[in-house]
Amino acid sequence: MIQDIQPHQFDNQYKPCPPDAQSYALYYEGQSALLKKRKDGIDFPRFRDLERLNEEIYEEAVYLFTIDEERFYLVQNISRERLSEFTMENKESFRYAEPQYLAFAGITGYQLNNWYRNRKFCGRCGHKMRRDEKERMMRCDHCGNMEFPKICPAVIIGLTDGDKILMSKYAGRAYKKYALLAGFTEIGETIEETVQREVMEEVGLKVKNIRYYKSQPWSFSDTILMGFYCDLDGEEEITLDREELALAEWFRRDEIPVEPSRDSLTNEMIIKFKNGEV
């Protein structure tokens, strides 16, 4: 999956040390990131590439994380028109970009950029917030409100019936490939209850034997994904929620129209079932 960057080591401990000329500078506009496309993959600008465009870039940078010995920072206020070798590319390109550790850095930085951008002012009193010196947190000095990075719990559901698995396609989304049922956890429910509710809401089916598989940070949607397999409890007849899904179909293992990819928990769960590993 996209976070599996071994032998590289990701360190998200907040240690706001200043950048140097070799540090990576991550810059975003909307859903796009500034990067360089090379024959062997992508690369991000370093501070040495940007210092001529903004003399205060070192002072304004926000520490994000470290991969191996490489430090990554968030930067703003860049005249990118003067950076002809770099282009703005949509965040979706990080799903398959190489090298994988830089793709993971790019999408993780994107999540943090959105959080910082959306937490400039306090949601309780409206005053300006500031970055905390010791933790990755935004603090309001006026009312004491503290905001931590947005991470939404959600489930991916591999619903099976013997040698068949239920696969679906989203309604009204750009992503048109087959996926598994999925949804966000609501207030006051357990993760297992989320699985039961989402299956009932989206396809009108009951489930049993819910069992945890694996989790994945999914910065594309500020989410921590938790994968579960479960068994059908009752008849296979589907009642489709057409606001959420364009279709939902049962597939036998040898009929599954999905090939392995390295990015998502959903794909890994489908391929595990396809190969008879679960």
Task: Please place each PLM-identified region on the residue numbering.
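Active-site proximal loops enriched in glycine and acidic residues that flank catalytic Cys/His/Asp
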Residues: K169-Y170, A182, R211-Q216, L232, ...
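Cys/His-rich short segments
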Residues: T108-G158
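Nudix hydrolase/Nudix homology domain
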Residues: M1-R119, A174-Y178, F220, D241-V278
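N-terminal strand-loop-strand
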Residues: Y28-L35, M137-L180, K206-V207, C230-L232
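Active-site-adjacent beta-strand/loop module that shapes the phosphate/pyrophosphate-binding cleft
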Residues: Q216-T239
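The catalytic Nudix box helix
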Residues: A179-K214, F228
